[in-house]
Amino acid sequence: MENVRFSIIENDLKWNSESDPTADVDLLLDKRSISSEANSAGVFSDEAHEIFARQQQNQILWDLDEVKETLTESPGGKHVVDMVQSGCFLELMTDSADCNLALICCSVFGSVENTLFLLKHYNADPNVADSRGRTPLHFACCRANAPIAKVLLDFGADPNRWDARKEVTSLHCAASSKSVECILLLLRRKASINIGIEKRSALHYAIDVNAVDCVEILLKYGADPNTPQVYTETPLHTASAAGFAKCVQLLLSHNADVRSQFGEGKVTALHLAAENDYVECARLLLEHRAEVDCRNASHQTPLHLACLSQSIGTVDLLISYGANVNAVYRDGRTALHAAIVKQSRSLDCCNALLKAGADVNKADNYGYTPLHIAALNEFSSCVYTFIEHGADITARTDGRVSALSFIVRRTPEIIPKLMQKLDSSIKANDQEIGDVDCQIKLDFRLLVPSSSMDRGETELLLSLIEVGQKRILMHPLCETFLFLKWRRIRKFFLMSLAYHTLFVILFTFYVIWVYVRCCKKEELCVAPGYVSTIGYLVIILNLILLGKEVFQMAHGLRGYAKYWENWLQWTIGTGVLLCVTPETVRTDDLTAVPVWQHHVAAIVILLVWLELMMLVGRFPIFGVYVQMFTKVAVNFAKFLLAYICLLVAFGLSFAVLFNDYPAFENITWSFLKSITMMSGELEFEDIFYGDYAVKFPVTAHIIFLSFVLLVTVILTNLMVGLAVSDIQGLQVSATLDRLVRQAELVSRLESLFFSRLLRSAPTNLIQLCKRSALLRTSRDKLQFTIRPNDPRDNQLPEDIKLNVYKLVAERRDRNQSLRRRQFENNYNIFSRSLQRQQQPLHTDFLKPEPATGTTKKTPQNLFHMHELLRPRSATNVPQQFRQEAEGTVQMKNQANVLSAVLAEVQAIKTQLVDLVAKFERFSENATRKLNYSTDELCRLRQQGQSVASSHIRRHR
């Protein structure tokens, strides 16, 4: 079995570090596996990792400690660095190289006055470089020190000079330091804006640090957003990989090429944005006509990378822009295969893809469907989602391993859910379950996946048998399906049975005439002439049977070899050819038949009739009894093997004690005689009182008595009791075995009609056979309706109909019990609430004291308040339900009480409405009276004031 890819769908993808993105870059580049559960960033391509590593390096172009260490290692560097930091240049000689080193130090440590002093008075070289080719202008721009950069440029510093590694110029340094002033200063001094564009220009460095203003200035002054070489990193790649949406927008507004590819992986900007879940960047790229299904070197689309990294936001965006959800990449995998990476987010991606129409049964080049991968990784939620969307659980890999096999071993919790789906496939109409008009509809579409229509209709049942879940065949849906299938192929089986019956009868007649008929020695033994004709007919029929076996073997040798009936058929065919030979076909002298042919004929005639019994046992009406016989025979053989040593012991002992007796003269005959004596055929008188005297009387009597007690009494009864101890269980087991054999028989017959060996046969004949064998020719018609209470409905046997009826009745009773329990809970809560509302509210203890105006909080009042505010309990539910009749009466009484309560509530509501209306009228009258009183008081006040003023004037 193919366990090579267990829990591995992308074994060449890289991990993302859980730590800060600025740390452990080497580890980020080296680890290869699937993203873990704890990692939420997804998986990255090689190109994305390359961009990430370069961005970490360019965030701090040159570390200050590293620069200081480089300057100190120069000749006299430590002394010069100390002088620059102290600002004293008295010991600096004009003809010494120290002045150039001091100029570099001044550009590093940011001293404008000292820089100008060195350039004017010491004639320092503005283009001097350290051991790594870095000039003072490099350091000034890297430190974003525009004044020093201006001074250096005024004294002739070269703005386009490279460092020793040909990696950066002063413009690169200014862009990396986010210095707009330095960039403008350099551009005004004729700095080449596209210098280094073959690898990485200043625009790349500005994007590395997300310097939006610098990017805008560079683009405004003519920076090229594209690169002249193919498969090189463009600024758009850099911005998309980092998720800098504003930079992406600026680049796109300046005609950046959205189709350009980068690196050996040939990834586009949309690939980089999709695999890192930068939704805004992806949206901008798609709005500017980026190809939604563009492919990289591995034939992956952005949707594949988004699913691999579990970028659900980007997945939804790409689907909304028409991404092909069924596009395949390496090894024939689809986006649905790629989405099964980690369980925490796989379900969201899978749901989005399935909603967009992803093919849930699409297999990769190894035969693995998404259901296989989900089951292997033990993602039960994804497994159930796939099954809900029509995934074929019978789909097999190239190693012939079904998805159901993975489900049973890796996600066994799906099996009960599968049983629930089988239950839900049997539905009844709205009629009462005991009504004659009650109809039950059985939907077989779950048993016949859409992808298996070209392989027959019993593939699921065979898969259940294969993985050890054959008890599911006893489900009413499966049992009904098997019965209907049997009814469809019954005609083919009857033809086969008739053919075998004819063959057995002719062969039996031939054996009787050739091998059984007794002739006197002095007479010539001659058979009738038609016996030779029968012999030739037997040979022809036998060759046809062997041809059928050859066809079945060519159809599938592995499946053919595992059925013992096929080996029995080859044994019979070979034996018949040995029995019906030219010597036996001649009827003039039957005494010339060799003795060995009599032995062969005796064995073959037994096997022929045994095979006919097994064929008859395939009928449902006889199958249980034949299976019970087979089961008991197998059990009896096991027990006989367990006690074979005891029988051998007694056989040898009898051979020693009774060697004169004919049955015990030979050890072989002695053993066979011991087995015969188990059935009770002891022959005590013949052995002890016959013609032969017992040589060892005492020992012989003891051994014989021991045999009678241990074997005839104990062992025989024990074996019979163990073999048939549980008749009811034996019937159930036999019924299950019958269903298994019936399913295998139907499947084998169907497989012959769909065999590739019949492609050259007439098409009309094959289609006729298929229509005769298949239950329905259309998937939408895989439904069957019965009326269990209608005596005229005889479509199904009574036992199957009863099982279907029980399942529907139990489910309906269970639902009614749940509804009844919910009603009782709601009614109890409502009745208690109503009682609390009708209970008078005790507010005496809330009245304030006459003197203090505060509430008197006594222990009695507090207890009473607690009782009033205590929440109503909803747990007073009866533990045991009443009988059905009592429950119905109680529900009617409760409904009457509820109606009365609702009427009282309506009356109270009407009274409250009247009270509210009266209160509103009272408040309006009170308001008018209050306004009138206020006006009168104002008028009286004015009148009093006028009277008082006139009185004062008169008094004066």
Curated annotation (Swiss-Prot):
It is a multi-pass membrane protein. It holds the Pfam family Ank_2. The keyword Glycoprotein applies. This is Transient receptor potential channel pyrexia. The chain crosses the membrane at residues 492-512, 526-546, 566-584, 602-622, 639-659, 702-722. Keywords: ANK repeat, Glycoprotein, Ion channel, Ion transport, Membrane, Repeat, Sensory transduction, Transmembrane, Transmembrane helix, Transport. ANK repeats lie at residues 132-161, 166-195, 198-227, 231-260, 265-294, 298-327, 331-362, 366-395. PANTHER family: ION_TRANS DOMAIN-CONTAINING PROTEIN, TRANSIENT RECEPTOR POTENTIAL CATION CHANNEL PROTEIN PAINLESS. Belongs to the transient receptor (TC 1.A.4) family. STrpC subfamily. Residues 1-491, 547-565, 623-638, 723-956 are cytoplasmic. InterPro entries: Ankyrin_rpt, Ankyrin_rpt-contain_sf, Ion_trans_dom, TRP_cation_channel. GO terms for molecular function: calcium channel activity; monoatomic cation channel activity. It comes from the Eukaryota. Receptor-activated non-selective cation channel involved in protection or tolerance from high temperature stress. Activated by temperatures above 40 degrees Celsius. More permeable to K(+) than to Na(+). May act in stress protection allow flies to survive in natural environments. One of its GO terms (cellular component) is membrane. SUPFAM superfamilies: Ankyrin repeat. The keyword Repeat applies. Glycans are attached at N666. GO terms for biological process: calcium ion transport; monoatomic cation transport; negative gravitaxis; potassium ion transport; response to heat. Expressed in various peripheral nerves and the central nerves in embryos. In adults, it is expressed in sensory neurons lying beneath the bristles around eyes, neurons innervating the bristles on the back of thorax and neurons in maxillary palps, proboscis and antennae. Expressed in multidendritic neurons, which mediate temperature sensing, as well as non-multidendritic neurons in larval epidermis. Localizes ubiquitously throughout neurites. Its main location: membrane. Homooligomer; between isoform A and isoform B.
